[in-house]
């Protein structure tokens, strides 16, 4: 299945305790249908000490959130939107905004080099 939301996309949370929060996708977990978004779904983790390496304590970290709870923000119209797919004249499959019909390029963080 094609990824509608990829690493580097700007998204808004539409459900849950962080509803309305915006952030960039730091990591995409496609097998679990989850994403990690900067500044969203902050949890506290109790860490054990490892002698000589790290100190014990409580750290705050971003936990994964289900991909159905976030919506892509279109870089062209600036609104939360659903994502569609279509083929260009060259036969390349691209994402597009369902509101303004503009092609949404994949962020530089996600682009693969061959």
From Swiss-Prot:
Report the SS bond pairs. Answer: none
Task: Write the record's keywords in alphabetical order, separated by commas.
Answer: Ribonucleoprotein, Ribosomal protein, RNA-binding, rRNA-binding
| Keyword rRNA-binding set for record | yes
Q: Name one GO molecular function term.
A: rRNA binding
User: By its UniProt entry, which InterPro entries does this protein fall under?
Assistant: KOW, Rib_uL2_dom2, Ribosomal_uL24, Ribosomal_uL24_CS, Ribosomal_uL24_KOW, Translation_prot_SH3-like_sf
Task: Using the record for this protein, list the coiled-coil segments as residue ranges, or answer none.
Answer: none
Q: Which domain of life is it from?
A: Bacteria
Q: Does the keyword Cell inner membrane apply?
A: no
GO BP, sorted A to Z? translation
Question: Record's Pfam families?
Answer: KOW (PF00467), ribosomal_L24 (PF17136)
Q: Which GO terms describe its cellular component?
A: ribonucleoprotein complex; ribosome
Which PANTHER family does the protein's record reference?
MITOCHONDRIAL RIBOSOMAL PROTEIN L24
Q: Tell me which family the UniProt entry assigns to this protein.
A: Belongs to the universal ribosomal protein uL24 family.
Q: How does it assemble?
A: Part of the 50S ribosomal subunit.
Q: Function, please?
A: One of two assembly initiator proteins, it binds directly to the 5'-end of the 23S rRNA, where it nucleates assembly of the 50S subunit.
Q: What is the name attached to this protein's record?
A: Large ribosomal subunit protein uL24
Q: Which organism is it from?
A: Thermomicrobium roseum (strain ATCC 27502 / DSM 5159 / P-2)
